[in-house]
Amino acid sequence: MWWRRSRTNSLRYTVHPFASLQRSMIAPMDWTTIDACRTSTELPRPVEIRGWIRTRRDSKGGFSFLEVNDGTSLGNLQVVAPAELENYAEEIQKLTAGCSVVVQGELVESPAKGQSTELHASSVRVIGWCDGETYPLQKKRHSFEKLREWSHLRARTNTLGAVMRVRNRISQSIHRFFDDEGFNYLHTPIITASDCEGAGEMFRVTTLNLEKLAGSNRPFDTKQDFFQKPTHLTVSGQLEAETYATALSRVYTFGPTFRAENSNTSRHLAEFWMVEPEAAFYDLNDNMQLAERFLKRVFSDCLSHCGEDMDFFNERIEKGKIDQLKSVIEKPFEHMTYTDAVERLLACDEKFEYPVNWGTDLQAEHERYLTSVVGGPVILTDYPSSIKPFYMRVSDDGKTVAAMDVLVPGVGEIIGGSQREERLDVLQRRMAEGGLDESEYWWYVDLRRYGTVPHAGFGLGLERAVQYVTGMANIRDVIPFPRTPGNAEF
């Protein structure tokens, strides 16, 4: 609304001076998506669609069947193109997979099985040709490993297109959930001088000419670098998020994070996306309840909004996936301490590749076993302080910390979090024990000097969530352009 004062000094509503400009810039689309066409009940009606050819089949009856997809749905829309069209022989009968087209015609009820609508074309305009001889995505099925070589094209396949739509839904659900919970969305730095995890597995950021330095035999002097100190790509936005949680009460970050781990596994990426909420005045119980509500909301949204894609994953990728997600949504999460979990693992008859001992990290095989025994998600708490980062709150026993990991069936850990250490002296002691230079974290320590409060948070790797929801076996297939050791293509 736009208000101004009249000559009588009263407020009057007038048209905003930029309103007409905005309307012209944001004109409604004048074509219809494939998804809308396939689900339309307003028939018959004229429509225009824009998309890419999946297949073409010529009929002896004097027309061609074109399967067109625009990425808005898993299924294609069948276009019936009659021979009477002026470019039928010259263009339509030469269409191959990958060609882009604009089709106008009448959307009608389809007599064919497996589809509710089809488009009877009055015009088929070819926008971009695609060489059928060299186009990689032919009819034959390619392995996911092979498709990674064509990451710039693989979203055009059924599976990867469905993965990206689910990834989008999860991302949207994350934002909506935290907005509903009263959290502020916070942008934390990607370039940082802090190591949140204290593991040192970080990518170095520098503008110095390293080749020139190597040839000069001079020592590496960070004072000559852009930031005049060692800097890295962030492994987490948690520490920065804590600073804003102690001002705004509830915040969350959602952005790219980086780990320089030389791990070539189906569960690890060098670059991935993390969502990290932080809440002041939260203890570990509050944190666990938030994590449970969060996962249930995300999974529920995927089932509600991605029905066709989820049916596809349930049938083609992992049988029973939908029932598994429904079970997670409907059942309360089981709670178990780390110590209880270790005792269960030691008492069971299962043969594990990695031995189980109190004081060591649980492996994925241990986590999967626990969820299978419980028959649903498990939240493990109270881990040994020796295997957890310095910022986690030390428990009264002095041996454990107020940490939590959320484990889900088939995958294991999907969320990791904790109540943060709010006591200045304990935090300083933990940093010293970990060999951390307190002067590098002076701003973080300051939070405990000026109005410290109990607070907690957790982290969820987006790709782990997408992998779990879709059932995809390899994490490299749930991110558009995977970054792994030896691979930074595209």
UniProtKB/Swiss-Prot annotation:
GO biological process: asparaginyl-tRNA aminoacylation
Major localization listed first in the record, in broad terms: cytoplasm
Gene3D superfamilies: Bira Bifunctional Protein, Domain 2, Nucleic acid-binding proteins
InterPro entries: Aa-tRNA-synt_II (IPR004364), aa-tRNA-synth_II (IPR006195), aa-tRNA-synth_II/BPL/LPL (IPR045864), Asn-tRNA-ligase (IPR004522), Asp/Asn-tRNA-synth_IIb (IPR002312), NA-bd_OB-fold (IPR012340), NA-bd_OB_tRNA (IPR004365)
Signal peptide range: none
Compartments, record wording: Cytoplasm
Name of the protein in question: Asparagine--tRNA ligase
Lineage, highest ranks first: Bacteria, Pseudomonadati, Planctomycetota, Planctomycetia, Pirellulales
